[in-house]
């Protein structure tokens, strides 16, 4: 468990405060987990973003009439802190009985508070239900590898030694899996996800990738660190010209978290999958 997470509200009984309370946000420094991976915060080997989507966003108009919407928050992957998810939910719930003059005022408030907690500017978008409904759901790009026949009996820790690739053949391809699962390091609750890998480099053995992803099944870590571990393990093996790892996790507590790590400075689309 991350030392800072022990002091967060995650896994503890909490009072639900219904009026604006930005102090509920609980930042957790990324540095300790980066150190575990052998990564320096001064020279990160990736670019990217963490997309958070909130499906339980509500506030009051000046008349007292409530509004519901869906919030999208883009936290830079190089921000000093992640925001602990339960504290994020409690903070958003504190808006439920708070009046805002306009959506613009709400967005400015959210951006100010979340940026302060993350330690870097967080982009905020508030959408109507109709706008999000019109977007529908999408599918991951590339070939799904989930039908491959693999055997595995160890799920406690990620096993990069399972990964295999060709040392003679270079390919450019995109593959994905819906079998990613890890556990919350604080509560032990399951985190279900889908992950897409896009790269140009040594040809990755698809069955070995699937087995490797399944090896995360009982691993306890936050979403962001799981994706960063996958990225680093693949980067070491494939020696790619470029590499992207993008995970879309199933929501818990009205929030889903979607980390994106890449060698390239390309902003991904934040489009929902069928399980989201």
From Swiss-Prot:
**UniProt-listed GO biological process terms:** queuosine biosynthetic process; tRNA modification
Task: Locate the residues binding substrate.
Answer: 83-85, 223-224
Major site of localization recorded for this protein: cytoplasm
Question: Where in or outside the cell?
Answer: Cytoplasm
Catalytic residues (UniProt) = 184, 191
User: Which UniProt keywords are listed?
Assistant: Cytoplasm, NADP, Oxidoreductase, Queuosine biosynthesis
Keyword hit for Oxidoreductase: yes
**GO molecular-function terms, A-Z:** preQ1 synthase activity
> Which reaction(s) does the protein catalyse, per the Swiss-Prot or TrEMBL entry?
7-aminomethyl-7-carbaguanine + 2 NADP(+) = 7-cyano-7-deazaguanine + 2 NADPH + 3 H(+)
Q: Which Gene3D superfamilies did the record assign?
A: 3.30.1130.10
Q: What InterPro entries has UniProt attached to this entry?
A: GTP-CH-I_C/QueF, NADPH_dep_7-cyano-7-deazaG_red, QueF, QueF_N, QueF_type2
Its Enzyme Commission number(s) read 1.7.1.13
Instruction: Name any one Pfam family assigned in the record.
Output: QueF
Which residues are noted in the entry as NADPH-binding?
85-86, 252-253
Which residues fall in a coiled-coil region? none
Q: In which pathway does it act?
A: tRNA modification; tRNA-queuosine biosynthesis
One term under GO cellular component: cytoplasm
Say what the protein does: Catalyzes the NADPH-dependent reduction of 7-cyano-7-deazaguanine (preQ0) to 7-aminomethyl-7-deazaguanine (preQ1).
- Family membership, please give it: Belongs to the GTP cyclohydrolase I family. QueF type 2 subfamily.
**Assembly behavior:** Homodimer.
Q: Which PANTHER family match?
A: NADPH-DEPENDENT 7-CYANO-7-DEAZAGUANINE REDUCTASE
Please give the name of this protein: NADPH-dependent 7-cyano-7-deazaguanine reductase
Annotated source species: Pseudomonas entomophila (strain L48)
Q: What is the lineage of its organism?
A: Bacteria, Pseudomonadati, Pseudomonadota, Gammaproteobacteria, Pseudomonadales
Name of the gene encoding the protein in the UniProt record: queF
